[in-house]
Amino acid sequence: MNIKSLIRTIPDYPKPGIQFRDITTLLKDASGLRQVVDALVERYAGAKVDKVVGIESRGFIVGAAVAYELGVGFVPVRKKGKLPGDVLGHDYALEYGTDRVEIHSDAISPDEHVLLLDDLIATGGTAEAAAILIEKLGGHVLECAFIIGLPDLGGERKLRVLGYKTFSLCQFEDSE
């Protein structure tokens, strides 16, 4: 089964000109969801992974399942103000303004190997911020993995230039 065929495209959402790649249609399909989780688990089985970090919010869904299958812990990276307790945060640029993601200050131990996972990579700002947080806590980013890559927006390229390995299960061009 082609997972790309299970991802719905919603034109002009959340604003005109955006092609929103909606994974809820993939997630509701039991075999499609299983295929995504299995493909990611297969890729990282045997690798040194101590934790899976998922980015809010769709990264939580697949990230937790992958962590479970790999037998490792799961750590959420959330938007500002959503985590209780001591957190470490990092601001990143948006098209207009900035946003912030946070992680618990005790979520990653020094020298842990971390798989960073999200549903989609566009410009790479959120993934870069999450990777920086992992490194500030002393962790090593094994790879930044995504269900969907949008190569026209340059996020994976940006992460690779910064020294991070990237992987996407499927790619969508702007014209698709």
Curated annotation (Swiss-Prot):
Q: Which UniProt keywords apply?
A: Cytoplasm, Glycosyltransferase, Purine salvage, Transferase
Quick one: where is this thing mainly located? cytoplasm
Query: Is Glycosyltransferase given among the entry's keywords?
Result: yes
Report the pathway entry: Purine metabolism; AMP biosynthesis via salvage pathway; AMP from adenine: step 1/1
Q: Indicate where this protein resides in the cell.
A: Cytoplasm
**Quaternary assembly:** Homodimer.
Q: Which family does it belong to?
A: Belongs to the purine/pyrimidine phosphoribosyltransferase family.
User: What does the function comment of this entry state?
Assistant: Catalyzes a salvage reaction resulting in the formation of AMP, that is energically less costly than de novo synthesis.
**Protein name (Swiss-Prot/TrEMBL):** Adenine phosphoribosyltransferase
Q: Which gene encodes it?
A: apt
